[in-house]
A protein has these predicted regions:
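SAM-dependent transferase fold signal centered on methyltransferase-like domains
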Residues: 1-344
Length: 344
C-alpha cells in the first residue's frame, strides 16, 4: 500500500532531494508542492519500512521527513480544529506517562484564526497533563531516551499528522532557536552551528576551538557560551560583545595562526566555494589532534549540481579527515554541513 510523507528541502535543490529519496526508497512521486521547501511525496514502500530505510540512507539534501499516518479536513476555526487535531493525534500516537515527547507543527496557507504554535501548545499541554515530559531545544538534550515525535502539518484546509520516534528521523527536533539561548543572538548564522551541534550530538565543555570565517561572531558567541577558548579568524570586525570576551583571540588572517597551535575543534563557515574551503581545512588539519572533530559548511552555487560539488569537496577532505556525517540542516540554505574527524 502506498505511503505518504512530507519532505523538507532547500527550494533550489527540490529535484535533487526527491531524487535521493527515490534512490533510498525505490520510488518517490511528488503529489503536491506546499511551497517553502516542503512537498507531499508518495512511495510504494510500506509505512513500517519508510523511516527505517531513510534513517539508514546517507541523505544529503533531504532536511527532514515527516510521515503521514492520518489526514483530515480543517475549517480554520481554532475552537473546532484544535480539538479535532488532538483527537486525530491521539488516534495514531503512542505516548505514555513518563515518555519524553516533542510536538512539531508547521502550516502553509491562510484563513485560520490560530497559529502553529497554538497547535503545539494545545496538543503538548494534553500530553504533559497526563504525565509525559515535553522536550524543548532549550534543554540542550542531545542524547538519552528516545523522544516520541508528533508531526503536524497544516496546508490550507487539510491537516496531516504523523507519529514516530526520534531515532527514526533525519532531524528529530526543530526548535533550535531556543537551544543554548544563554549565548544571546549575534547573527542568524549562529543557529546553524547550534543545530549542527545537536544534529551531530557534539557536547563541548571547555577546550580550544578555531573559528574560520568568524565575523560577525555568531559561531564564536555560541562556542564561548559553551566555555571554550576561541581563536576567531576573519579580516572583518566582530560584534563588540564577542570581541570583548577574555576567552577570545581575533586574528585577521590564517597566516597569523601560530604554527604550533593545537585545537580540540575547528569550525569553518567561510563564504568561499566548497573546494577552496575543503583545501583550506586540509591544510589546517595539523592543528587538530587525531580523532578530533571539524565542522565545515560547504557553500553551493544556485543552479549547480549539489551532489557533484559536495563529492568533489569530500574527495579533497579525505586526504586528512574521515567524513562522519553530511547533512542539510534546517538553517542551511545553499549549503550543506559536514562533521569530520581527523585521521590518524
Amino acid at each position: 500500500m502506498p505511503t505518504k510523507f512530507i519532505l523538507y528541502f532547500t527550494p533550489d535543490f527540490e529535484a535533487y532531494a526527491i531524487k535521493e529519496v527515490e534512490g533510498a526508497l525505490g520510488s518517490a512521486r511528488k503529489l503536491a508542492d506546499f511551497g517553502g521547501g516542503t512537498a507531499l511525496i508518495e512511495t510504494d514502500r510500506e509505512r513500517k519500512d519508510l523511516l527505517f530505510l531513510l534513517s539508514k540512507a546517507r541523505l544529503i539534501l533531504a532536511k527532514h521527513i515527516s510521515p503521514i499516518d492520518v489526514e483530515f479536513g480543517v475549517c480554520g476555526q481554532g475552537d473546532k480544529d484544535l480539538i479535532s487535531i488532538l483527537d486525530h493525534v491521539l488516534s495514531v500516537s503512542y505516548v505514555l506517562k513518563g515518555d519524553r515527547f516533542s510536538i512539531q507543527c508547521r502550516r502553509r496557507g491562510t484563513g485560520s484564526d490560530y497559529t502553529s504554535k497554538d497547535v503545539e501548545v494545545f496538543v503538548g499541554s494534553w500530553f504533559e497533563g497526563n504525565g509525559s515530559i515535553p522536550v524543548f531545544s532549550s534543554t540542550g538534550v542531545v542524547s538519552g531516551p528516545e523522544i516520541k515525535v508528533v508531526g503536524i502539518y497544516l496546508f490550507n484546509n487539510v491537516c496531516y499528522v504523523g507519529f514516530s520516534e526520534s531515532g527514526e528521523l533525519i532531524n528529530e527536533h526543530n526548535d533550535e532557536y531556543r537551544l543554548y539561548a544563554k549565548a544571546g543572538k549575534v547573527s542568524r548564522s549562529q543557529f546553524k552551528l547550534i543545530e549542527a551541534l545537536r544534529k551531530f550530538k557534539i557536547t563541548m565543555h571547555g577546550g580550544r576551538v578555531l573559528d574560520l570565517g568568524a565575523a560577525p561572531g555568531g559561531w564564536s558567541n555560541v562556542l564561548l557560551g559553551l566555555g571554550m577558548e576561541v581563536t576567531a579568524v576573519d579580516p572583518a570586525a566582530l560584534d563588540p560583545v564577542v570581541a570583548a570576551s577574555p576567552n577570545l583571540v581575533h586574528l585577521a588572517s590564517i597566516s597569523e595562526i601560530p604554527p604550533d597551535g593545537k585545537f580540540d575543534l575547528i569550525v569553518d563557515d567561510m563564504n568561499i566555494d566548497a573546494e577552496s574551503s575543503a583545501m583550506m581545512l586540509v591544510g589546517l588539519s595539523r592543528l587538530l589532534g587525531n580523532g578530533s572533530n571539524a565542522i565545515i559548511t560547504l557553500k553551493l552555487k544556485k543552479g549547480s549540481n549539489p551532489f557533484k560539488a559536495v563529492n568533489s569537496a569530500i574527495h579533497i577532505l579525505w586526504q586528512s579527515y574521515d567524513v562522519v556525517s553530511v547533512a542539510s540542516l534546517f538553517h542551511n540554505r545553499l549549503e550543506v554541513t559536514l562533521l569530520l574527524a581527523k585521521k590518524g
